[in-house]
Amino acid sequence: MVTEGKDSKVALEQSWLELLYPEFKEAYMQELSSFLKSEINEGKKIYPKGNEMFLSMNSTPFHKVKVVIIGQDPYHGPGQAHGLCFSVPKDVKIPPSLENIYKELEEDLGIPKPKNGCLLTWASQGVLLLNSVLSVEKGRAGSHALKGWERFTDKIISKINEKDCVVFMLWGQYAAKKAYSVDTSKHLILKSAHPSPLSSHKGFFGNRHFSKCNEFLNSKGISPIKWEIL
């Protein structure tokens, strides 16, 4: 799942591959790969599909990253996860957290609620939609936590931290802790409650992160994100 092809090349976009290839040689990634293969061999259903585990990076090359949104782990229901945090394929019902994200988007920028939950439009503009854990067993939220993904995605964040003027949109305590080492002197850190129905009224609604993000990007001479979903 981590590598593919007869030469065991990592199925990863070139700019990310150049940065992260050494990680795939580390023992923890070898152990993670063995774990995933073992789970599949035991007949367990793993989400997202293997070719979508790295969709966040494959959709948003390193040099294009302007914004980072951090999730915890993929949706564990059939057909939901496709490699982008909070996002689902176009033909899948919009999950509750994403419904609330859309509500805030409309309140903040006046953008009508999109008809689908696919966030590839954001990803293609430089919004890295990164889950901390990149796989999950069907029906078992958090089942692939502490298997190595967190260390891998920590490395991704550390590489992005080397860039300048990136916006980190951190929703909930988990995301805030994940990005604790980000250099606040050159990046914009936006924190609020998580958009889950359990916490959205505790500070997510009204956070105006979408407009604040674009205000920052504009101030740095960086083209803003068009948040409309196509």
What are these regions (language model features)?
Residues D7-L20:
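Generic N-terminal amphipathic, Lys/Arg-enriched alpha-helix
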